[in-house]
C-alpha cells in the first residue's frame, strides 16, 4: 500500500493525524542529516509492525511511503480514512 503524507519536522512529538483527506505526520527530529526520515521510518515501523520505506520525497515535506499491509489494516491501525 502506498500512502501520501506531509511531514512536519521539529514538532516536539511523533503523531499521525488525518485531516481533510490528508495524512500529516509530526516528527520530533530536525530535517538535518536525514534525522527526520530515520525517525519517520523507525516510528512508523514500530506503530504499524510492518515494513515501511520512503519511495518518494526524501528531501521534501511531501512523501510517499510504501507499507506492507492492506488499506483496511492501515486505516484501522492509524484510525484514519483513506
What are these regions (language model features)?
Residues 1-42, 53-59, 63-82:
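Contiguous, often N-terminal, cationic amphipathic patches that form binding interfaces
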Residues 46-50:
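Beta-rich strand-turn-strand
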Amino acid at each position: 500500500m502506498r500512502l501520501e503524507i506531509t511531514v512536519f519536522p521539529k514538532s516536539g512529538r511523533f503523531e499521525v493525524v488525518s485531516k481533510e483527506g490528508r495524512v500529516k505526520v509530526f516528527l520530533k527530529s530536525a530535517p538535518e542529516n536525514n534525522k527526520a526520515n530515520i525517525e519517520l521510518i523507525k516510528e512508523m515501523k514500530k506503530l504499524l509492525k510492518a515494513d515501511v520505506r520512503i519511495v518518494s520525497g526524501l528531501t521534501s515535506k511531501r512523501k510517499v511511503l510504501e507499507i506492507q499491509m492492506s488499506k483496511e489494516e492501515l486505516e484501522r491501525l492509524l484510525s484514519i480514512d483513506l
